[in-house]
Amino acid sequence: MSGKAYFVNGEHGPAIIEGPLTALNWLTILPVPSATAFDRVTGGRVMASVPFIGIVLGIVGGAIAFAATSLGVASIVAATVIVCFWELFTRFMHLDGLADVSDALGSYAPPARAREIIADPATGLIGMGACLISILIHISSFTALLDAHLWWMVMITPMIGRFCAIFGAHSRLKPMNPTGFGAMLIGTVKTHTIIAWLCVLLVICIGVPLAMDRGELITITILGLLCSVTLALVEIRHLHRRFEGMNGDTTGFIMHSATALCALVFAVGVGIVA
């Protein structure tokens, strides 16, 4: 995700429109109009809208899961289609961040060299291994959830993962590089934005199970949220210290790993309850 855009002056539109549309343009394959200005205002609006992208992914993934369950499609096939769709829809952007950061962490190199590894377009063995592990966790966990006819838990997973990503751009964090894509994003998310989205996620984690008449699973959805946020905070602390800053790739790393953990917690929790 890093190094793909540079600061450009321009005019801004209404935040409530510009933020989500630009997020869709930057982070998905949808050809929607985006902001003409490339600055930290735009970056902040995009990061504040990242959980909205999670909602879009969740709704589409949930629709695929529901249709597959209704039609009797094998759970592993449906789970694979959902994960592949998400990766294609987001241009593998976050998977790329997972690979780049994993390679840098696995190198045990000094911060300056680690940042060079992140910027290197080539992917090493550690990065490929991390991607494989994450994808396998996604598919196996979703298979278990679909076997239990809990398609709506698949829907919630990317919402939680995208929410966790915005912690990695909190105003207390600094970018690795003062220019480029990461500098537009890192340090732009305010605490009140995180709190607002946390309230939305809590409503989803409580309201959806109740709407599906599965109130006994609220504990699991809340636990998935808490575990994912905890993982994100631990990762942010380590990454910020390890690389002496954050960038777009670290955001993708946090997002992908938090989503994988959420899916795993959901699947294990449902298995225990069952």
UniProtKB/Swiss-Prot annotation:
Pfam families: CobS. Its EC number is 2.7.8.26. The keyword Transmembrane helix applies. It is a multi-pass membrane protein. Pathway: Cofactor biosynthesis; adenosylcobalamin biosynthesis; adenosylcobalamin from cob(II)yrinate a,c-diamide: step 7/7. Keywords: Cell membrane, Cobalamin biosynthesis, Magnesium, Membrane, Transferase, Transmembrane, Transmembrane helix. GO terms for molecular function: adenosylcobinamide-GDP ribazoletransferase activity; cobalamin 5'-phosphate synthase activity. It is found in: Cell membrane. InterPro entries: CobS. It comes from the Bacteria. The chain crosses the membrane at residues 46-66, 69-89, 117-137, 151-173, 192-212, 216-236, 253-273. The keyword Cell membrane applies. It catalyses: alpha-ribazole + adenosylcob(III)inamide-GDP = adenosylcob(III)alamin + GMP + H(+); alpha-ribazole 5'-phosphate + adenosylcob(III)inamide-GDP = adenosylcob(III)alamin 5'-phosphate + GMP + H(+). GO terms for biological process: cobalamin biosynthetic process. It is an enzyme of class 2 (transferase). Its cofactor is Mg(2+). GO terms for cellular component: plasma membrane. Joins adenosylcobinamide-GDP and alpha-ribazole to generate adenosylcobalamin (Ado-cobalamin). Also synthesizes adenosylcobalamin 5'-phosphate from adenosylcobinamide-GDP and alpha-ribazole 5'-phosphate. NCBIfam families: PRK00235.2-4. HAMAP family: CobS (MF_00719). Belongs to the CobS family. This is Adenosylcobinamide-GDP ribazoletransferase. It comes from Corynebacterium diphtheriae (strain ATCC 700971 / NCTC 13129 / Biotype gravis).
